[in-house]
Curated annotation (Swiss-Prot):
It holds the Pfam family zf-RING_2. Residues 18-27, 731-741 have a biased composition (Basic and acidic residues). Disulfide bonds: none annotated. Residues 1-50, 177-214, 238-387, 500-543, 561-619, 638-688, 713-741 are annotated as: Disordered. It comes from Schizosaccharomyces pombe (strain 972 / ATCC 24843) (Fission yeast). InterPro entries: Znf_RING, Znf_RING/FYVE/PHD. The keyword Zinc-finger applies. Keywords: Metal-binding, Nucleus, Repeat, Zinc, Zinc-finger. This is Uncharacterized RING finger protein C2A9.04c.
């Protein structure tokens, strides 16, 4: 039990270093309210704070078509395995042939005639096979064998474990830097990042100044798009030449190496890394830490962030300064089972709260005195650190443009019950009305009474829980009678080369539903990805990524809020059943907020919700009968008339409080709804003599006492053909025919 507590404390303490006063103000800021004069440092807070999001676009410059990289060319694709290609000297051993020397003029690759021009010159390889020059050249750019017999030629291994250039452009609403923090201002100035930059103001100034100057809007948009670019340049790569005598082509020499893991023992409590470990860490060559995947690239990017403490400051980090992978310390209990590895899956990358995220939004960084990288069991954590004000961070990376099908997988990784990244169990409470968990994992019962005791019963339990966690971590929690909320910050990045064709409309997710009430602090985002005037990037790709990011961000927020509501209702069901017993009379109008699932926006109070299968039922479309614990107003599934028997009035028993999907359990058929395969009923009369083929749909009907209806002309024609008497014309012809039979 203590090990689990220390494990959670280690994750929570490792996330404390990214917070500061400006960071908390940014998370607590409400976009719908403006701070008045004299109240610049105060922000209105509510019972449940929204989740703070940030989204950015990553552009990775990769080689283009017909790429002929030399030995010192750094622009090689880092996401592909090393390629063995033929060297240029291998062409010296190839023999050009004329038409007289050829038995067949057809190229085995393109099936075109050879020797029509210089590009289709017939070329004979040392193995004896003949191909067109252009086809053979394209093949040997990525291969070192004959296309037919697979015999090798002199080749070189081309591949680079280093990323070429990484651009990260944030799209989110940014915050002004802390003007009082001179150290941060100097650091941002040295990195080319201005702390007083505000995208919305720059955009407004660009629109207003555009009337006076023609080049002013382009200059302002250029600042918006590229003023906050963080990039990484890759060192030169080298190609490994392999002679033709190599008899093991399946095991070539590759310059890709796995970063070594170095343990850094600590001298004692509150002690820093000694000089020997620091010097050995500085002497690490770049070949020891070459990230080969995007996950490793992020790890290297985090470990080399300029926001980290300088070398002369006492460092307690368990991350090496120039290594691209996570390293463990022998004196700590920090788990690394869920950390990204060198060969991790491409999508989605597992979020890790143990990694420091990049300071993309230019938020004020934490000072070295208030930074702690050690678990909560260590004693070098500052006493003035408040855990409740330290938001934790989750990093999510997508290769390409993620579809809506990827969101459930991301939510599962965030809400799984036993995961280290669980938003509900990460050593804190997401917001005060969530279910609290004690140290042994038991759920605290919630008071279901309608009196004011509900507001005073759950809060002290949460407060005591926070105080216990604070004592364990060595922090001080203010005793203000309320439970502080933990604000997770989720960074979502979209990775896509800018020169690829834009994704079609079929691949883009649908427009997000407009929601009412409190929005996220990053819901209002500017299109900061417009291309500059020099045309180094293609505009449609960047603009498309910006629009995609906004839609994905809004949809992700909606999916997360719906999932949180479902989790809250499911977690409150066992506590309610244990407190309520078999049956409790509870007024439906006075139910607890945890018993309701609200979906704001156009789904609320809408008649179309009943026809949707995947939407969560709202409190306006479901009424819970507390006496029998039965949902009596669930949407029905219509069945054919011959299937429904005498039990048409029965209703399916659906337990209250459970998040059962709509139309999951069939109930009684409604009289005004019909199965699509059932015979449609109609109030229009039907002629009983239509089988004779003389009916006119526009003719008038004649109704008889027996209930049959016949067209007037059909009746007259039948009577005339049978030579009936005038007194028998009023008889139904259908009944008369049945009597004769």
């Amino acid at each position: 039990m203590d090990s689990n507590t220390n494990e959670n404390n280690s994750h929570a303490s490792s996330n404390e270093r990214q917070s500061s006063e400006g960071h908390d103000d940014y998370l607590n800021r409400n976009p719908n309210s403006e701070a008045t004069e004299g109240e610049e440092g105060t922000h209105p807070t509510t019972g449940t704070q929204p989740v703070a999001f940030s989204i950015g676009t990553m552009f990775i410059i990769t080689p283009q078509a017909n790429f002929e990289g030399g030995e010192n060319d750094p622009f090689a694709n880092p996401f592909q395995p090393p390629v063995k290609r033929a060297v240029k000297e291998a062409w010296d051993s190839f023999e050009p042939l004329s038409n007289d020397q050829l038995m067949d003029l057809t190229c085995p690759i393109c099936y075109d005639d050879m020797n029509e021009n210089d590009e289709k010159q017939a070329t004979k390889m040392p193995c004896g096979h003949i191909f067109g020059k252009n086809c053979l050249q394209k093949w040997l750019e990525n291969h070192c064998t004959c296309p037919l017999c697979r015999k090798e030629v002199p080749h070189e291994t081309v591949g680079s474990a280093h990323p070429p250039i990484l651009f990260i452009i944030p799209h989110s609403h940014t915050l002004r830097g802390n003007q009082g923090n001179t150290a941060v201002s100097q650091e941002n100035a040295s990195n080319g990042v201005h702390s007083d930059f505000h995208p919305s103001e720059e955009l407004n100034n660009a629109n207003t100044d555009g009337r006076t100057g023609v080049d002013e809007p382009a200059r302002q948009l250029h600042r918006i798009a590229f003023n906050r670019i963080r990039f990484i340049l890759a060192p030169n790569r080298s190609a490994t030449n392999t002679p033709v005598e190599n008899t093991h082509p399946e095991n070539p020499d590759s310059n890709t190496s796995t970063p070594t893991t170095r343990s850094e023992p600590l001298a004692g409590e509150g002690a820093s890394i000694d000089a020997e470990n620091a010097s050995s860490r500085q002497e690490t060559t770049p070949s020891d830490s070459r990230p080969s995947t995007l996950t490793s690239l992020f790890n290297a990017f985090f470990s080399s962030m300029p926001d980290r403490p300088s070398s002369n400051e006492p460092m307690t980090s368990n991350l090496t300064s120039n290594s691209g992978s996570m390293t463990n310390s022998t004196s700590t209990d920090l788990p690394t089972s869920n950390l990204p590895s060198q060969n991790a899956p491409a999508r989605p990358v597992e979020p890790s709260p143990s990694i420091q995220p990049p300071n993309l939004l230019n938020l004020p960084t934490a000072s070295p005195e208030s930074t702690s990288w050690l678990p909560g069991s260590q004693t070098n954590i500052p006493a003035n650190t408040n855990r409740s004000e330290r938001p934790f961070t989750q990093l999510m990376t997508f290769h390409g443009l993620p579809s809506l099908a990827d969101l459930p997988a991301v939510l599962e990784s965030m809400f799984r019950p036993s995961g280290n990244n669980n938003l509900l169990n990460l050593n804190g409470i997401f917001h005060p009305d969530h279910n609290a968990q004690t140290e042994n994992g038991q759920t605290l019962p919630e008071n279901t009474d309608d009196t004011n005791s509900n507001a005073t019963s759950a809060v002290p339990n949460l407060q005591n829980l926070n105080q216990q966690n604070a004592v364990t971590m060595g922090t001080n929690t203010p005793n203000n009678g309320s439970s502080p909320a933990v604000h997770p910050v989720i960074h979502i990045y979209l990775s896509r080369p800018p020169l690829q064709p834009a994704v079609s409309e079929q691949e883009t997710p649908s427009e997000a539903v407009s929601r009412e009430g409190t929005r996220s602090t990053d819901a209002t985002m500017e299109d900061s990805s417009r291309p500059p005037s020099n045309g180094s990037f293609q505009g449609p790709g960047i603009t498309h990524l910006s629009e995609m990011g906004q839609r994905i961000l809004q949809r992700f927020q909606e999916e997360m809020e719906n999932r949180m509501n479902q989790t809250r209702s499911e977690s409150s069901t066992p506590a309610q059943q244990s407190a309520a017993g078999s049956s409790i009379n509870v007024d439906t109008a006075g139910r607890q907020p945890s018993d309701e699932i609200n979906i704001p926006g156009e789904y609320e109070n809408s008649s179309e919700v009943a026809g949707s299968r995947n939407q969560t039922p709202t409190h306006s479309s479901i009424a819970v009968d507390t006496l029998s614990n039965v949902a009596v107003d669930q949407p029905a599934i219509s069945t054919p008339s011959d299937v429904v028997g005498s039990d048409a009035g029965d209703t399916s028993k659906v337990s209250s409080g459970t998040s059962t999907p709509r139309m999951a359990a069939p109930i009684a058929r409604r009289s005004n709804r019909h199965h699509p395969y059932s015979r449609p009923s109609s109030t229009r009369p039907q002629c009983q003599l239509e089988d004779q083929g003389i009916c006119d749909p526009n003719d008038r009907f004649v109704h008889f006492e027996c209930g049959h209806s016949v067209h007037e002309r059909c009746q007259q024609s039948t009577s005339n053909s049978e030579n009936q008497m005038d007194e028998e014309i009023g008889e139904c012809p259908k009944c008369r025919n049945e009597e004769h039979k």
